[in-house]
Each structure stands twice: as structure tokens, then as C-alpha cells.
């Protein structure tokens, strides 16, 4: 059996797996040092009491012969799809256009696989590594990286003369923590509609947006229905990162170049490849959607971001993002070699972060801080950061 050649196109190891290995090695070499891990974007706040109550009752039903259920509907519980249409989209998206999944990461891969190999995929640079990896595994002909730099407020620069099949866009963005404005989204939507491209819009962090003028969904712009697919997740909004649940939206208006509706193929794809998300988790999400987002947890993470921003600025770092996202994109002084960023924060501050270059070439010169930690860890990190200026640490 020959190896799938697409694997040879990937980096040797996944970014966050490499970070975990480095942290583990440092802890083994320095057992007396307390490491604060602000590298991985995982949640730390518990599930809401009402969500937990529904979850528990639903699981208990599986232990009773009279209430036991096996497989659920592949496309998701109709009650949950209706609730999302009502609460999250205010009717702009119908329940029939919403599909419940086991998380955003799998949705990205499934949707790119739906369109088949040989496509040209554009991703933001810097960007979540999964977009590039899944595009390559799905057999993309070409992956184009769209530079997102501070000079353009991290808005992607679209290359001229390139025929792009699919744009992978994330807003609020991971890793920069910045948000696309309505005007910026309209520009991208106009481009996609005029060039026959599809926008794969990752809105997994939309619950963090507090400014009503900033779009939480690409479908707040009506013209997106003919060019966009949206992905979202309960991981950050309700703390479901450990139980896995998300959703995607494929509008009925979205069509192939031959006029056939994409939604029909998507249903066929899911019926073949997916048996549906966990029923107890979906039922818990129905309760959670009524609370959406879990404002107490979101407020906690926003407070963390505010504390980190203040501490980093006091230590003379330039900080971007973090106001409408759980990530802060931190520019590191140019006098420090790029490859030393991770080691610098680990050895000087005993804080683990994510080096920006792991998100792409345009991430060089930056690091990402996650505000999804516990408050005691955030406060301890802030104390370490503000002891001295970053420039004093480099002496």
C-alpha cells in the first residue's frame, strides 16, 4: 500500500502538539518551576448549571429501557436547529439550512472534502493551522496565503490574477484576535460573488463580540447567502470543548456553477459520513442556546483579556486584538530573534505562549496569548509580566 501523498505536504508535527511537548520537556528539566500555560485556546469555566442539569437527565435516560435511544438524526435534532435559527440568526437562516456537528475542526475538513480535490484554497496569514492542513489532506491543488498585517488592520490582501475557489476566513480571528467590520465583509462578499468563489466563514468566537456594529455572522449581510458557508461552535460560547458540538450553515441559495444547489450534496455527504452528534450533548445545547452565550463565562474571559492587555502594555509590548476575541496578538521587539520567542517567555516569565510563526509567515515577530485560563493563572501571569520591562529582560 502506497502512502497518501497528501501527508507529505504537511508540517512534520501539528503546532499545538509541538508546544505541549516543549512544555512537558521544560517541566521535566525544571520540576520546581511553576509554568503558566497561556498557549492553548481551551476553556476553563464550568458548564452552566441549567445546561449541566439537562445533560445529566439526558444521559440518565440512556440507562432506562423505556427512555433509551440509539442513533439520532444525522443532520441534528430539529429542536436545536430551530432554536439556533431563532436565537442566533433571528430568522435570517432557516432551521433546514443549519446542520449540527461534532465541532468546527471536523466541519472544516468535511466541507473542504465536499468540494473535492484540485481546488485553490485561500487562507489568512497568519491563520489557524487546521485550514491549511485540512485543505492539503482534502487534495487542494494550491493553497494561497493572504497576508494580514498590522498596516492593513490585519485585513487580508487579495491577490490579483488568482482564481480562488474557496476562501477560509475566521472572524473574530484566531490568532490575531481582530474582527472583520461589516464594510470589510461586504468587500469580500462582493469579490466572492463576482468571481464564483465560496467563503468558508469560521465564526467560532462570535460570542465574544460586544460591539453591535460588528457582524457576529456573515449572514447579517444578505448577499452572503449566495457565496458563503458558516461554521460555528459551542466550545467557547458554552464551554463545550470537552463534549464536542458545533454547527454549520449551508444556504439554499448557494449553488455550483452549473446551478445545482450545494445543500443537496451536503445532506448526501452527511448521510454517508456522519451518524449525528451526541444526543445528550445536543439536548444540553438546546438549554444552552436559550442562555446563549454563557455571559458569565464570556465576561470572565473578557476580564482576563483586559488584565493581560494592561500587563503586556505596562511591560512595553504592542498588543492587538483581545477586545472581541479570547486572543491577544503581541508584537515582540525586533531585537529578539524570532525562533527564540517561545523559549524567551518560558525561561524569562515561566509563561507558555504560542509563537506567531506557527500560524504562518506573517506571524513572525508576534506571539499569541490566550485569555481562556483561570483568573488565578491570569493574575499570576500579569504579575510576572509587569515586574520589569521586556527590554530589561533582554539585557
UniProtKB/Swiss-Prot annotation:
Substrate binds at residues 14, 41, 105, 128, 174, 275, 368. SUPFAM superfamilies: PLP-dependent transferases. The gene is dapL. Homodimer. It comes from Chlamydia caviae (strain ATCC VR-813 / DSM 19441 / 03DC25 / GPIC) (Chlamydophila caviae). This is LL-diaminopimelate aminotransferase. One of its GO terms (biological process) is lysine biosynthetic process via diaminopimelate, diaminopimelate-aminotransferase pathway. Keywords: Aminotransferase, Pyridoxal phosphate, Transferase. Belongs to the class-I pyridoxal-phosphate-dependent aminotransferase family. LL-diaminopimelate aminotransferase subfamily. Pfam families: Aminotran_1_2. The modification N6-(pyridoxal phosphate)lysine is found at residue 236. The keyword Transferase applies. GO terms for molecular function: L,L-diaminopimelate aminotransferase activity; pyridoxal phosphate binding. Pathway: Amino-acid biosynthesis; L-lysine biosynthesis via DAP pathway; LL-2,6-diaminopimelate from (S)-tetrahydrodipicolinate (aminotransferase route): step 1/1. Involved in the synthesis of meso-diaminopimelate (m-DAP or DL-DAP), required for both lysine and peptidoglycan biosynthesis. Catalyzes the direct conversion of tetrahydrodipicolinate to LL-diaminopimelate. It catalyses: (2S,6S)-2,6-diaminopimelate + 2-oxoglutarate = (S)-2,3,4,5-tetrahydrodipicolinate + L-glutamate + H2O + H(+). Pyridoxal 5'-phosphate binds at residues 71, 104-105, 128, 174, 205, 233-235, 244, 275. Its cofactor is pyridoxal 5'-phosphate. Its EC number is 2.6.1.83.
